[in-house]
């Protein structure tokens, strides 16, 4: 009964009050893990609200973020800092940029003594650490390095055998043999099995004849082809003669080493036509070209024969029984490119967020009457733009580091389950991280106003150079479909009692949770302790993925009856893409939480917990409609999530300087006047001649 003078309480009020009491009781019984009070001193501001003042242990945070290979990164930084003539100037022409990029790569290898190719298979984490460092010098250089060592070099050592490694390793390693990776054609990119270039075996001369049958089969966008390449790994359909002289046998797409220029004179070899693809939106330090082959003959030994070979008498032999299995094995060995792009994209985001946040702390505009102007990062709108992005940068750092570790383990063990896991994870992270970074680069530019528009402050160059990350090594939309297909396969395994791969284990439990109704009591819990509980956050992410998976499986089954499997997939395509993105966000959050829990320093753990909470709640709020539609979150809880997200943005703003400093990027690496650690405006004015 309500006491006299109190308004009548509704049944909903009673229900909410009961829910809060149950929540408080459960929190007493089950303490929230990862209490982030370590290193957080509470003080009371004028309004009487608690305001957290966090003292960040910079040494510990920076050390935890560094990874194992900071030493070799510093060697890269020191080399280019000592050679200012190798720094890429603003406004450089395409021709000069290409030559400079080649000089940078040769200097790195021959002068600095850093040999990335030796780590491609032996220590992939070290290789990607070098790539991150050179990418901060010039993204074109990182891509040039990737073409030379990961694509051209990687195809030789991963698709070839000992005879190929013995013949080509040293020349690739010291850049005496600059090479190309000739897969994409004018008419076919994502559909590699649709490539039209042919490699026909001639048993009389013991040679393959490489031929471009039509304009659609011209190799297109081939890095290193326009100017510097001397060899190309050409992907072509292997065609063998049969007993019937009028017929041939198509054995599927294989890889062949094709010399394209003379080693001494550098002249284009007979039968090969090379053209320059010209100016691009970005990455103009990379010489992309187009290749046409007119019945070019190469020795039989130039077939990269790890997964299939042709004998002297034209017989085909492979340990893999079908074209599809050989094709999958071939492409599977090239997954490192996607791993590298996800990792590199996160590195680009570190540079951009560092520049934007340092400038936002420096820049002052407006303020209370008769008081000093305030930093633009003190405005809630600026915090809303940049703080969730900073949290995502940290999340991507840990998730891509884990991907690199898994990839390295896969290269050592060749464990079949791990191979499948890395393929799907690299596809999803590459697609998700590069798409997010592309949008964020524009946000950073806008957040820095007019000064963000100056080329010298790098946003334009970074945005243009990074833009293609969404397309090469697999179009992002296509890659997300691969993730969705893998999820549906795991879903089928779950209901058939099979074993799920490690990354997908959560589906077993969360699918069971999804198939029951959301708990009406927990749907109303709104305390900060509950919302910042990693279990609530991860459960919410995984519930959403399971809900999307279950519903799209039902839709596909329904539409397949009338449209067939291809038509049904296309009808549900947007749903499938949302499912894939949801799964990748779950993977990213799970790894972020694990990285926080694994941190040995209590102060740093508290700092990272704050950033992780912002990442999780911002993502939940970003898709709050989904949670509301199924009553996973009640209206009062949705409002609490929004309020807490805004507060966490404010909290992260208070340590934003320390968080970007922990990326440990020296001024000569960020190279943006507005982001200098000291005297930024002075250096900016000096740059234009004052």
Curated annotation (Swiss-Prot):
<keyword id="KW-0276">Fatty acid metabolism</keyword>
<keyword id="KW-0443">Lipid metabolism</keyword>
<keyword id="KW-0285">Flavoprotein</keyword>
<dbReference type="InterPro" id="IPR036250">
    <property type="entry name" value="AcylCo_DH-like_C"/>
</dbReference>
<dbReference type="InterPro" id="IPR046373">
    <property type="entry name" value="Acyl-CoA_Oxase/DH_mid-dom_sf"/>
</dbReference>
<comment type="function">
    <text>Catalyzes the desaturation of long-chain acyl-CoAs to 2-trans-enoyl-CoAs.</text>
</comment>
<comment type="similarity">
    <text>Belongs to the acyl-CoA oxidase family.</text>
</comment>
<keyword id="KW-0809">Transit peptide</keyword>
<keyword id="KW-0560">Oxidoreductase</keyword>
<dbReference type="Pfam" id="PF01756">
    <property type="entry name" value="ACOX"/>
</dbReference>
<dbReference type="GO" id="GO:0055088">
    <property type="term" value="P:lipid homeostasis"/>
</dbReference>
<dbReference type="InterPro" id="IPR009100">
    <property type="entry name" value="AcylCoA_DH/oxidase_NM_dom_sf"/>
</dbReference>
<dbReference type="GO" id="GO:0033540">
    <property type="term" value="P:fatty acid beta-oxidation using acyl-CoA oxidase"/>
</dbReference>
<feature type="binding site">
    <location>
        <begin position="448"/>
        <end position="453"/>
    </location>
    <ligand>
        <name>FAD</name>
    </ligand>
</feature>
<dbReference type="InterPro" id="IPR002655">
    <property type="entry name" value="Acyl-CoA_oxidase_C"/>
</dbReference>
<feature type="transit peptide" description="Peroxisome">
    <location>
        <begin position="1"/>
        <end position="45"/>
    </location>
</feature>
<keyword id="KW-0330">Glyoxysome</keyword>
<keyword id="KW-0576">Peroxisome</keyword>
<dbReference type="GO" id="GO:0071949">
    <property type="term" value="F:FAD binding"/>
</dbReference>
<dbReference type="InterPro" id="IPR006091">
    <property type="entry name" value="Acyl-CoA_Oxase/DH_mid-dom"/>
</dbReference>
<keyword id="KW-0274">FAD</keyword>
<dbReference type="Pfam" id="PF02770">
    <property type="entry name" value="Acyl-CoA_dh_M"/>
</dbReference>
<dbReference type="InterPro" id="IPR055060">
    <property type="entry name" value="ACOX_C_alpha1"/>
</dbReference>
<protein>
    <recommendedName>
        <fullName>Acyl-coenzyme A oxidase, peroxisomal</fullName>
        <ecNumber>1.3.3.6</ecNumber>
    </recommendedName>
</protein>
<dbReference type="GO" id="GO:0005504">
    <property type="term" value="F:fatty acid binding"/>
</dbReference>
<dbReference type="GO" id="GO:0009514">
    <property type="term" value="C:glyoxysome"/>
</dbReference>
<dbReference type="InterPro" id="IPR012258">
    <property type="entry name" value="Acyl-CoA_oxidase"/>
</dbReference>
<dbReference type="GO" id="GO:0003997">
    <property type="term" value="F:acyl-CoA oxidase activity"/>
</dbReference>
<dbReference type="Pfam" id="PF22924">
    <property type="entry name" value="ACOX_C_alpha1"/>
</dbReference>
